[in-house]
Amino acid sequence: MKIIILLGFLGATLSAPLIPQRLMSASNSNELLLNLNNGQLLPLRLQGPLNSWIPPFSGVLQQQQQAQIPGLAQFSLSALDQFAGLFPNQIPFPGQASFAQGAQAGQVDPSQAQTPPQTQPGPNHVMPYVFSFKMPQEQGQMFEYYPVYVLLPWEQPQQTVPRSPPQTRQQQYEEQIPFYDQFGYIPQLAEPAIPGGQQQLAFDPQLGTAPEIAVMSTGEEIPYLQKEVINFRRDSAGVLMPSTSPKPSTTNVFTSAIDRTITAKFPEEKAKTDGLREP
């Protein structure tokens, strides 16, 4: 058992390189490269333009030498620490302007990148979708905002309601009285008066009622006359039929078709047959 443990330690010591070597991949792509130098783990190194955005490990005193890439701004470690506390949409990217400042497109200088952009609230200022809960400037001031869909009383559009012409007490009383028919409740509304001295004739084909003609003079007012209901339909029939049609009689339908001479012979023949049957 001890031999196996010793062989394990020996293999672990032989596998660790004594000379710092740079591990390269076969495809030479943008992969993480690890260096071992006297048992100390150096910060990660990335081959590509994202080399400046990788923060170093904590506790490392040695700074990694980075190659200067033309066209990209190099940021210091203090600038990266300041960017970590900003909003996601307020981090300035190299080659384009910050979203919060709204400036024209251009490259960001290292001196400007070290100071975080300060936004001042204005009328057209758009709040970011991620915001902190503690705002030192506006912590003591709490405002109540109305939703967008709420309209104030003085902003609501005024709706004009058409007013009906004034009616007399007699007409209002007649409109409230219901009219009961065999079909159920049918409200009767008063017909509007036509200026000119005569009222409009209204014939209801469903009810079969014809109102009276109310003649009104221009100088005096005649109260509205109650309708006189004239029934043009039969109570037993479901179809409207005029009352002037002759009523069919069903009393002599069967008597006229039977011959009375035949009916008189039946009792005589019956009496003869009864007499023959008797012994």
Swiss-Prot record:
One of its GO terms (biological process) is regulation of actin cytoskeleton organization. InterPro entries: Odam (IPR026802). Residues 100-123 have a biased composition (Low complexity). Keywords: Biomineralization, Cytoplasm, Glycoprotein, Nucleus, Secreted, Signal. It is found in: Secreted; Cytoplasm; Nucleus. Residues 100-125 are annotated as: Disordered. GO terms for cellular component: cell periphery; cytoplasm; cytosol; extracellular space; mitotic spindle; nucleoplasm; nucleus; supramolecular fiber. Residues 1-15 form the signal peptide. Its main location: secreted. Glycans are attached at T115, T119, T168, T244, T250, T251, T255, T273. It comes from the Eukaryota. Residues 127-129 are annotated as: Interaction with ARHGEF5. O-glycosylated. Belongs to the ODAM family. Tooth-associated epithelia protein that probably plays a role in odontogenesis, the complex process that results in the initiation and generation of the tooth. May be incorporated in the enamel matrix at the end of mineralization process. Involved in the induction of RHOA activity via interaction with ARHGEF and expression of downstream factors such as ROCK. Plays a role in attachment of the junctional epithelium to the tooth surface. Interacts (via C-terminus) with ARHGEF5. This is Odontogenic ameloblast-associated protein. It comes from Macaca mulatta (Rhesus macaque). The lineage of its organism: Eukaryota, Metazoa, Chordata, Craniata, Vertebrata. The gene is ODAM.
